[in-house]
Amino acid sequence: MNNLSPPSTVDILEQVYQVIQQRKSAPDPEASYVAKLFHKGDDAILKKVGEEATELVLAIKGRAARNEVAHEAADLIFHTLVGLAIMNIPPTEVMNVLSSRFGKTGLTRNQTPSVELEPSRRQFERRLHSKTIHLIFSSGITIDGLTRDISLDGMQLHVDYADKVRLLGEKGYFELSVQNKATFNANNLLVGLEIPTTMDNNPLMAAVHSARTYRFEFEIVRVTEDAIGLRIIGDKGMFSFALANEVFNDLM
């Protein structure tokens, strides 16, 4: 009797990935389909990934036969692995991220993760704060969320909203007041200020503070039981400027 258990999903993905790694460096582009893709370059590979994703979307949207949808999904997974091979990212690394994202913790960071991950490349840019953000959606919905985690890409918010699933893919905006701080020598000020003289004739310093409100557009890209994840779209440079000015440190 054969007591061997069937290969797991991770095992299958890893085996396919190893074959891709072996074939991608073949000197002859006609040696295999993978070799031909890599000889065409990264752009050709990424274009193919996009094409396969579109075909899967169309198959699902058109309610194609189950085997056809499964076939398109397999094509997309295969070409995604080819894309990962460009950067030598194994599927096990992706599965670890998935385990962390959709495990018991979801977006919550104050619990023990289901899988211990290596530090993210953007971990040094992430900041933990607690600030209320007023979200205004294109659909007209308005929701207040409490920040949990913020990075240059976006933020995670705790929200008390019953139908959060419907928010996935929704776009909108929020506004933040960013304070600019500057220090000027009193002898060089171009504005009229009454500054008392000092006995030691030391230069007087005046701190000038101004604030400006900026609008940031977002898209909801993740939803869990009690939180949403949003991605900043549009001008990320201004959001980076807001972070640099500690806009999330003031408040509650």
UniProtKB/Swiss-Prot annotation:
Q: Which GO terms describe its cellular component?
A: cytoplasm
Q: In which pathway does it act?
A: Amino-acid biosynthesis; L-histidine biosynthesis; L-histidine from 5-phospho-alpha-D-ribose 1-diphosphate: step 2/9
Instruction: Give the catalytic activity.
Output: 1-(5-phospho-beta-D-ribosyl)-ATP + H2O = 1-(5-phospho-beta-D-ribosyl)-5'-AMP + diphosphate + H(+)
Determine if Oxidoreductase is one of this entry's keywords. Answer: no
Q: Which GO terms describe its molecular function?
A: ATP binding; phosphoribosyl-ATP diphosphatase activity
Which residue spans adopt a coiled-coil conformation according to this UniProt entry?
Answer: none
Q: What is the name attached to this protein's record?
A: Phosphoribosyl-ATP pyrophosphatase
